[in-house]
């Protein structure tokens, strides 16, 4: 079983690793942003409690997996950014442009 120092060391190493690969491209050429949100880790006699806030991601969009002693917490949220392009020559002609961007969150612990 991992000690608290192993977990904290993994969290620390993951922060640096995520900085190196913060923006990558997957097979479908979509940009994926890996984010390691702040976490509170509490160890009791019989539990390891990890608390984190995943802003903009609902419970049904979060996947939690434990495989080969590796905990993975993963989720995806879609943000809609509305940009308004105002035509200075004609104020009645406003073009609205909606840009959808997908953000993926994934954290893995051994």
Swiss-Prot record:
One Pfam family named in its UniProt record: HSP20
Domain sHSP, residue spans: 30-110
Cell division recorded as keyword: no
Annotated Low complexity bias: 85-96
PROSITE patterns: SHSP (PS01031)
Keywords: Stress response
SUPFAM superfamilies in the cross-refs: HSP20-like chaperones
CDD domains: ACD_sHsps-like (cd06464)
Region named Disordered: 78-110
InterPro entries, A to Z: A-crystallin/Hsp20_dom, HSP20-like_chaperone, HspG1-11-like
Gene3D superfamilies referenced in this protein's UniProt entry, alphabetically: 2.60.40.790
Comp. bias (Polar residues): 101-110
Record family assignment: Belongs to the small heat shock protein (HSP20) family.
Protein name from the UniProt record: Small heat shock protein hspG11
The organism of origin for this protein: Dictyostelium discoideum (Social amoeba)
